Amino acid sequence: MSPDVPLLNDYKQDFFLKRFPQTVLGGPRFKLGYCAPPYIYVNQIILFLMPWVWGGVGTLLYQLGILKDYYTAALSGGLMLFTAFVIQFTSLYAKNKSTTVERILTTDILAEEDEHEFTSCTGAETVKFLIPGKKYVANTVFHSILAGLACGLGTWYLLPNRITLLYGSTGGTALLFFFGWMTLCIAEYSLIVNTATETATFQTQDTYEIIPLMRPLYIFFFVSVDLAHRFVVNMPALEHMNQILHILFVFLPFLWALGTLPPPDALLLWAMEQVLEFGLGGSSMSTHLRLLVMFIMSAGTAIASYFIPSTVGVVLFMTGFGFLLSLNLSDMGHKIGTKSKDLPSGPEKHFSWKECLFYIIILVLALLETSLLHHFAGFSQISKSNSQAIVGYGLMILLIILWILREIQSVYIIGIFRNPFYPKDVQTVTVFFEKQTRLMKIGIVRRILLTLVSPFAMIAFLSLDSSLQGLHSVSVCIGFTRAFRMVWQNTENALLETVIVSTVHLISSTDIWWNRSLDTGLRLLLVGIIRDRLIQFISKLQFAVTVLLTSWTEKKQRRKTTATLCILNIVFSPFVLVIIVFSTLLSSPLLPLFTLPVFLVGFPRPIQSWPGAAGTTACVCADTVYYYQMVPRLTAVLQTAMAAGSLGLLLPGSHYLGRFQDRLMWIMILECGYTYCSINIKGLELQETSCHTAEARRVDEVFEDAFEQEYTRVCSLNEHFGNVLTPCTVLPVKLYSDARNVLSGIIDSHENLKEFKGDLIKVLVWILVQYCSKRPGMKENVHNTENKGKAPLMLPALNTLPPPKSPEDIDSLNSETFNDWSDDNIFDDEPTIKKVIEEKHQLKDLPGTNLFIPGSVESQRVGDHSTGTVPENDLYKAVLLGYPAVDKGKQEDMPYIPLMEFSCSHSHLVCLPAEWRTSCMPSSKMKEMSSLFPEDWYQFVLRQLECYHSEEKASNVLEEIAKDKVLKDFYVHTVMTCYFSLFGIDNMAPSPGHILRVYGGVLPWSVALDWLTEKPELFQLALKAFRYTLKLMIDKASLGPIEDFRELIKYLEEYERDWYIGLVSDEKWKEAILQEKPYLFSLGYDSNMGIYTGRVLSLQELLIQVGKLNPEAVRGQWANLSWELLYATNDDEERYSIQAHPLLLRNLTVQAAEPPLGYPIYSSKPLHIHLY
């Protein structure tokens, strides 16, 4: 990668310079890129200043004492409401009057770039350009009303006398009045005239026109605080807040332009998550619907607890609902309902009831403990001697033990020091299991302590608190509702918070504000917020330092401006630190602009970073099937690893990266609760691009240093500490390993190719015999033929030959076939299967269809005598309608189909279908090729059949079938015709190019080609035999020659049972992977290196390496990606921000984003993992 790849290409730079001023001003377009009449700019200025004009009228009347403040607000609001309706109806009139096609009202770059032809100041095209209008009539009315309210309340908010009362400064009042009205005009223009494209874009499409509401929403928030201050007296805090917000009000345009303030939809979801997690003790949820439902239920629980009069009742209510809301109730209900319908009896249903019984017992014990401790224990102020202090000491010990047991499970302790207890040099599953046994036992102990011991210990601590003894207040209800919920929802964090609160209380004086003014519930709430923000701050700081340092230390990342940016970051480091702190307080991503060390505060958004539900979209391709097979097994193994603590502390928003060969799995935790965790797994594309390969190579290096090296020192350091990826553990998963071998020395060997032809006939015989013996209805008729005294007559299959081809058919067939066999295509990696004349001869399939040949004598068909009264001698006449015209002197070479009779009454059980017994080759050619038929192999295969239940009769019957000459002749005819179709006219050894083509389903032209392709089932069997033979040739070259027929059958049975041999592009290839065939094989050709390759997939238990990613690095890069693509429209595939970065894993992070911004090839729906 060149370090000076442009951040934005010339076109996008020009586009950005036109769009950004429009965003700053709220919608006016003063930089168009083409010449426009002056009235275009004048009209926009008038529309922009219109709210200020009406607000100025009201303000002037108020200052002159003519109107009171609320009448002033009403007057300005009414005038603006009338103006808004006029503006909107003018837009509607222009649309109806215009004869041009109305443009689509979406974010369309091309539409923004179109040049408009303006005819007059008030022309339809001018009005449509200035006022695009609304998509929905409801929004036309609603937005107009909001515009009137915003103008009226804004006038009231910015009255000079009011501002002077707040600050007592005339100069400050003038500045706030001027810039405040600029802010108000920007918001009004965006709402009612033309909506600007916001830098804070959450949704890819604004379907319901929510974006215009963004700026007025913040206007209303600021005004609401001022109104509260007006009507609520004696609240100094509210007055200070109002003063601060009046100052911030003038900076709103800059916050809107920088994208710091979220749009309404993102703000709502973010606010619900924050309140649910820190105010109500819950967790962020896997879907927006679950978030809404859980938020309502949790808020209802907190409110209901306030109205319970009994203190014991309050404690029991909080304990019970805290436990129940921390469970995955929806999944449990769905599972029980599904099993009651689909699995009425089975171990899985019993397991679900055991699970429910376990939860009921835990709930009963928790309620019993809470009530007993609350009722009987003494409630004195906490001290070192009372019972709550004793429980606090126990919690400290428990926290230390759990931390040690968790860190032992990972390869690195706190991500820095090598864990001496973790297995070293783990490369195979067997070695891993041998060395991991002790750690798994420790993991079980940890899980018991975390799931059973810790919650009850914390419930004891909370139940003994004196705050619950007296009359409960709002703060007590909120704090303890959260505390009793956190005990179950996030046990490890709750334990840490409880220990901190207990420790601070024990070591500090009782007279300080912390102990005197706050109850235990509020202390826990504040400690929880501080804990979360401190972890975020450390992660953000580490991310910022990594971006800053690598921009200089990594040569491929160093640009001409890097030195300047580094110096500026050092000089303004306090300001950069303020940005990081502000981003941490808002819990919003730290946005590195273009992933350079230029940091901005991204707008707050949900923890998932994307508006849609996880797993709804993915860029599906041929490689997706590997993830479909792997994810269920990976999920099962993750359950054990998460329960043991191998992946560290499980928090919503955590990201993990799994690696195996060329596969990369991106794992994100969506939701956590008591004994469950919800995750999303994404599969990234296999290594193709150079950027992807470079970062994947660095991931391999990080994992190799962690898992595949012997360390001499006991506690060595993590050499890749600055990387966003920290190795955690390895997971044994049953999946496909991908091996690619060079076959050039085998497939082009003359001796191997010579043996190939003979082996092909044997494999054809075996496959056809196996197919016929296992056809539906064959085994059911085994006993029906034993009582028959006479062998059945075998009528020739008449009227099954293809009708004469038209010249167009012949030309089409020849051109397609010879194009496939041209020299340009012999090196294709996977020749495509040509479905030749599949629908060409549909007429022949119609019952009773006879084609009349001009000049011929019409013969009577056997099928015409439906009554069955056919003279016996007529049955022996072969009707050969449909054959090409030939010379009379050469008619002895034409095929003749006599009526035949099996010598064995059981032969029809392995007889070929009637349509396969038709002839298409001259008799002389068939006799010539019949000498190649291996009769001894044919008889051996028949004797090996297992189609009889009576073993004493089986050998005799199979011997009779093997000696049936008529049956053998049928097999000779069909096998040799297939053989002739696969190899063409030449009887020489095939070339490697020929092998590759036929393997791909492209057969050479021959007189038998049509005959074979018209029988799709037989065609597939012949192709299958050819592929089996190729695999047999490779195995013989690798493992040695085959000694006897039994060993050959062993090979073929293994292919049939354990292998799929075909093309990667086949649908059956994907089906075989999903069915978990043990092995898959495909033949290919590398045209760059000129070698033949074999690809073998082997299903086996192998180790997947898993590491934890810095969550703030992921969120920051995703925030930049969203800004670049949705606002700057920087979709250049070679842009700087998508290039490989070995420490930030920038390219992989972009891939893992939700489509359409990212492009994972697989994305699972939320997967619920049970942690017990």
Swiss-Prot record:
InterPro entries: Pecanex, Pecanex_C. It is found in: Membrane. Keywords: Glycoprotein, Membrane, Transmembrane, Transmembrane helix. It is a multi-pass membrane protein. It comes from Homo sapiens (Human). Its main location: membrane. PANTHER family: PECANEX (PTHR12372), PECANEX-LIKE PROTEIN 4 (PTHR12372:SF6). This is Pecanex-like protein 4. The chain crosses the membrane at residues 45-65, 73-93, 140-160, 173-193, 208-228, 244-264, 307-327, 357-377, 388-405, 448-468, 494-514, 534-552, 565-585, 607-629, 634-654. It holds the Pfam family Pecanex_C. One of its GO terms (cellular component) is membrane. Glycans are attached at N1120, N1147. Belongs to the pecanex family.
